[in-house]
Amino acid sequence: MASRILGSIKEEVTCPICLELLTEPLSLDCGHSFCQACITANHKESMLHQGERSCPLCRLPYQSENLRPNRHLASIVERLREVMLRPEERQNVDHCARHGEKLLLFCEQDGNIICWLCERSQEHRGHNTFLVEEVAQKYREKLQVALETMRQKQQDAEKLEADVRQEQASWKIQIQNDKTNIMAEFKQLRDILDCEESNELQNLEKEEKNILKRLVQSENDMVLQTQSVRVLISDLERRLQGSVVELLQDVDGVIKRIEKVTLQKPKTFLNEKRRVFRAPDLKRMLQVLKELTEVQRYWAHVTLVPSHPSYTIISEDGRQVRYQKPIRHLLVKVQYFYGVLGSPSITSGKHYWEVDVSNKRAWTLGVCVSLKCTANQSVSGTENYQPKNGYWVIGLRNAGNYRAFQSSFEFRDFLAGSRLTLSPPLIVPLFMTICPNRVGVFLDYEARTISFFNVTSNGFLIYKFSDCHFSYPVFPYFNPMTCELPMTLCSPRS
């Protein structure tokens, strides 16, 4: 009887999760109690799969702040442990709860230990029974194998749990990165729209100032015209009210002046053609922005390499070049055209860099094979700027003429030994709605293309060289021309 009561109490204070006696028991709002460690682990699992905390038994939701220590249960568990460790209670465990006899037999059919009276009862009649000592080793081995199996499964379960947690952390990082990228992309779009709005409003303000200025001038003209008419009216009234002499004095001149009076109508602007505002092509802008973002993934770290002799000054960090007026004694023999190369050389892959050309009146940039002796005093520098001579460049002249330089005839591999032909290049005019302060250069060596982007104008394509012949390593090329303002290599975050 005592064992049965003890077993009943044990059931009441057993954790439904780990099936062991409660350790640091916590009670939920629904009244069920669990080990602190068990309910904490269950809380994490519930939030992961269900998005809310719920009781493992009745599934009623609960709040973590409502978990409360159950000291009464903890006290019962503590006393139960003491009772279970007493020798007399241990002895009761070894005896049959029904008959009080010692448990010496094992029933194979029921898989349980029984006493000799149980064996003779109707319940176990015909069952195979053995002495506990005879089957103990057999089942000890089975349980040992089961223990090893469960330990391995525990390791596998822990690994699966760790894998899930790692995947969860990885997904959180990935989602956070995607959120950051999305926010950055839309911020960039908002910045573009804000810039477009600002430009449109500035243009409208300029138009308003211009029209109002002309209308004010027109108003002044109308005021003068009205005053002139009033003077004539006043003269006529004076003559009509005066004597005959005053009436006829220079009457022909007065009549002629009156006949010549022609009212000038004020200038109006209602019929003039005004620039109609059109919302920007967002689809096109997004496509262009996507293309620019794609090539910017291949941002290369380029530094400028001094060439001697050269009419340029390079900054200490190798990121800026400016024109320097030549020293007199170097004017006699010039073996190199003004310009510098970027490092490292390019022999494969995709490469992108950006150049700040703000406020410069002239510049040239792009890609070239090398600074060979491609210029001298008697040859204009632009004649070298041809793909057949190893230059794929665009440039600005006279603060407004943008151009690309193509070969004047079919390409010949000048590095293979053919003589340089110094005929003028084919000039391709480039039209810019927004003048570029930053120019992006993208080189795809395998695709044999070089593209130039107007970063200032949301990354619109300026020009593209196709079917380029790269027989040898190529280099980024920079020429500040005779404008003393610098050309500066930009960093990805600038």
From Swiss-Prot:
InterPro entries attached to this UniProt entry: B30.2/SPRY (IPR001870), B30.2/SPRY_sf (IPR043136), Butyrophylin_SPRY (IPR003879), ConA-like_dom_sf (IPR013320), SPRY_dom (IPR003877), TRIM/RBCC (IPR050143), Znf-RING_euk (IPR027370), Znf_B-box (IPR000315)
Localization per record: Cytoplasm; Nucleus
Modification N-acetylalanine, positions: A2
Keywords: Acetylation, Antiviral defense, Autophagy, Coiled coil, Cytoplasm, Immunity, Innate immunity, Metal-binding, Nucleus, Transferase, Ubl conjugation, Ubl conjugation pathway, Zinc, Zinc-finger
Modification comment: Degraded in a proteasome-independent fashion in the absence of viral infection but in a proteasome-dependent fashion following exposure to restriction sensitive virus. Autoubiquitinated in a RING finger- and UBE2D2-dependent manner. Monoubiquitinated by TRIM21. Deubiquitinated by Yersinia YopJ. Ubiquitination may not lead to proteasomal degradation.
Zinc finger residue ranges, B box-type: 91-132
Metabolic or biological pathway, per its Swiss-Prot or TrEMBL entry: Protein modification; protein ubiquitination
First-level EC class: transferase
Zn finger region (RING-type): 15-59
Chain sites annotated for binding Zn(2+): C96, H99, C118, H124
GO biological process, one term: defense response to virus
A GO CC term assigned to this protein in UniProt: P-body
Xref: Pfam families: SPRY, zf-B_box, zf-RING_UBOX
Family of this protein: Belongs to the TRIM/RBCC family.
Quaternary data: Can form homodimers and homotrimers. In addition to lower-order dimerization, also exhibits a higher-order multimerization and both low- and high-order multimerizations are essential for its restriction activity. Interacts with BTBD1 and BTBD2. Interacts with PSMC4, PSMC5, PSMD7 and HSPA8/HSC70. Interacts (via B30.2/SPRY domain) with HSPA1A/B. Interacts with PSMC2, MAP3K7/TAK1, TAB2 and TAB3. Interacts with SQSTM1. Interacts with TRIM6 and TRIM34. Interacts with ULK1 (phosphorylated form), GABARAP, GABARAPL1, GABARAPL2, MAP1LC3A, MAP1LC3C and BECN1.
Protein name, entry field: Tripartite motif-containing protein 5
Organism encoding this protein: Saimiri sciureus (Common squirrel monkey)
